[in-house]
Amino acid sequence: MPSGLICVARIGAPHGVRGAVRLWSFTADPFAVSDYGPLVTKDGARQFEIASAREAKSHLVVTLKGVTTRDEAERLNGVELYVARDKLPPTEADEYYHADLIGLAAVTTTGDPLGKVVAIHNFGAGDIIEIAPPSGPTLLLPFTNAVVPTVDLAVGQVVIEPPNEIEGDTPNHPEA
């Protein structure tokens, strides 16, 4: 398991006048973010502990120990919260933390280099893997078993089976 900090949440706008904030949790179970103990900023300069949490529409509403006013809460808007990697539970087979995938080499099933994994996105319809080739625009591909049949963390690469549209095959249309 790689070391370092993993981003598990982002603080949003204040909620109410007593220092509560909206919190977007990046954990599978949104409430698990409070199980990891104190959360820190990326630079480690500030530490936050969740005193209470409740579910809202698409986020949590939390109170943080030591944050008691709306003004204090407003200053935290946009702050990302991290935990040490070793505090996270181990992944199941075919499950990965996004942080483990970032920076891996991306190669085709024939071994040709495609680039490096720069991000994993989810816009609501499933995970998307973003690959930056050595030159040109990035590739956004569905992170499915069909398109990404192999993830090898030990070797440091993902194997990509590019869809036909990506490979540049000509469509089966007579007018093309």
From Swiss-Prot:
The positions making up the signal sequence are none
- Kindly indicate whether the keyword Signal belongs to this entry: no
The cellular location(s) given in this protein's UniProt record come to: Cytoplasm
Q: Which GO terms describe its cellular component?
A: cytoplasm; ribosome
Q: Which UniProt keywords apply?
A: Chaperone, Cytoplasm, Ribosome biogenesis, rRNA processing
What job does the chain carry out?
Answer: An accessory protein needed during the final step in the assembly of 30S ribosomal subunit, possibly for assembly of the head region. Essential for efficient processing of 16S rRNA. May be needed both before and after RbfA during the maturation of 16S rRNA. It has affinity for free ribosomal 30S subunits but not for 70S ribosomes.
PANTHER family per UniProt: RIBOSOME MATURATION FACTOR RIMM
What is the recorded name of this protein? Ribosome maturation factor RimM
Annotated source species: Rhodopseudomonas palustris (strain ATCC BAA-98 / CGA009)
